[in-house]
Amino acid sequence: KARFVEMFGDPEINSMNLPVKPMTEVCEIIDGDRGKNYPTQEEFSDEGYCLFLNAKNVTSNGFSFENCMFVTKEKDELLRKGHLNRGDVVLTTRGTIGNLAFYDESVPYENVRINSGMVVLRMNHEIVSERFFIEQFKMQIGSIKEKIASGSAQPQLPISTMNKIVVLMPSVKQQQVFTDFVKQVDKSK
């Protein structure tokens, strides 16, 4: 966080006056499948073809795979949306909102799908790095939560709200310097 602010300023107020873009131009926001093929409790198992993420899998510290639920290949193929590609970022949007996890090569599952309380953020790699986006979003989530605190029993972060979130856009080169720094810090942990 300190390194981010040092390099790019405070994303809440854009203290370094960097160019900005709406979140929807920085990444594609992909909703999960909520249709008639959504799995029932009986269709989940402790092992199987496709990891079906639940709220416990996406934490404030990224992925956690202590409690996993799986669906069969057949069930996975019936679902249209919400399948992850390497490099995708998962964002929780219902209940505990704002948790992020990065689906990179370190995740041991090849087939992963989000549940209905999440979205997939597929970055536009020409303009933004995932790690840069994740660190920036973590710094913004507090004020995002304040703005959407609607008093409802279950907090939600709808895509219509995500459309209004702005992302700092330093050069890709600067983002890469930051990303390399984060990778080094992660290695030393």
Give residue spans per PLM region.
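A short glycine-rich beta-alpha junction/loop motif
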Residues: 45, 110-119, 150-176
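Non-catalytic DNA-recognition/assembly elements of restriction-modification systems
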Residues: 1-35, 164, 168-179, 183-189
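A short beta-sheet element
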Residues: 54, 74-138, 158
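Short, basic/aromatic beta-hairpin or loop at an interaction surface
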Residues: 57-70, 111-112
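Low-complexity, Lys/Gly-biased intrinsically disordered segments
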Residues: 19-61, 75-79, 150
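A generic structural signal for short beta-strands and their flanking turns/coil linkers
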Residues: 49, 67, 115-117
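Periplasmic-binding protein-like
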Residues: 142-145
